[in-house]
Design a protein with these regions (language model features):
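Short secondary-structure boundary/capping segments
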Residues: 1-4, 135-137, 194
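Metal-dependent phosphoesterase signature
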Residues: 39-102
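Short, well-ordered alpha-helical scaffold segments within catalytic/effector domains
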Residues: 80, 101-105, 159-163
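Substrate-recognition element of Asp-dependent hydrolases with the DxDx(T/V) motif
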Residues: 84, 93-99, 104-136
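Short, solvent-exposed loop/turn segments at secondary-structure junctions
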Residues: 87-88, 125-127, 183-184, 203-204
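Asp-based, Mg2+/Mn2+-dependent phosphohydrolase catalytic module
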Residues: 138, 143-228
């Protein structure tokens, strides 16, 4: 893992430098509101310890909550936007490049060359997705993708999100293959009619594939994979 630890560590410096910019300040207001309404005892305990108790008392007071969200893998949309901005900083100054498994770049280029339409659906913001593939260790891969989706299209555990994605791609869901490392996402995509595969990679937190086929090397993948 490179990107998430980098964003976590860089949060204080980034907010110190950019916290008053209007677009960042708007994101921080959304984070403040989410924190205020977060029912989790851990979040509220942090809030009690935070310096000041009102929005506008300083961007730095939000750092513990933002880091807590990262540590608990809570995909708050304004946090994802902030992470994307932090990664853009890191990519821009050469501090980071995006790591990919060794088989991924060749597979993406092969699929694109075969005329397959490629899309990304991630909890990370669309700009963050595009930055990742633009600054991969294997070069700029962003041009291989035709469509980009984040949680603004809907939650990844809801079948309706996948119906919307298929419509945006101009395809019937049955013509779409969705690959994920999360069983709940596979179930939702399958519920929308898509073919699905579990990406089984080292370090995946949950490798339960349920009734679905696994794949651990994209060089093994062919267009009919996952279709029943």
């Amino acid at each position: 893992e490179v990107l998430f630890p980098f964003a976590r560590q860089a949060l204080p410096d980034f907010l110190g430098r950019h916290g008053k910019r209007p677009e960042v300040a708007a994101l921080l207001e959304a984070v403040e509101e989410a924190w205020r309404n977060d029912p989790h005892p851990g979040a509220q305990a942090l809030r009690q310890q935070a310096p000041g108790n009102e929005a506008g008392s300083g961007a730095e007071r939000l750092v513990p909550y933002l880091q807590w969200l990262i540590d608990h893998d809570i995909k708050l949309t304004p946090l994802k936007d902030l992470q994307g901005r932090i990664w853009a900083d890191g990519y821009g100054n050469g501090t980071i490049t995006a790591p990919l498994f060794g088989d991924v770049a060749a597979a993406l280029r092969r699929w694109n060359g075969e005329g397959l339409v490629l899309a990304v659906y991630s909890s990370g913001s669309v700009p963050a997705q595009q930055l990742l593939y633009r600054h991969s260790e294997d070069g700029d891969l962003s041009g291989l993708f035709s469509h980009w989706f984040d949680t603004r299209v809907g939650a990844k555990q809801h079948p309706k999100s996948y119906t919307e994605i298929a419509a945006a791609m101009g395809a019937e869901p049955q013509r779409v293959l969705f690959i994920s490392d999360a069983l709940g996402e596979l179930e939702a995509a399958h519920g929308a009619g898509m073919a699905v595969l579990l990406s089984d990679r080292p370090g995946n937190p949950n490798r339960d594939s349920g009734p679905f086929e696994r794949i651990s090397d994209y060089s093994q993948l062919h267009p009919g994979h996952g279709h029943q």
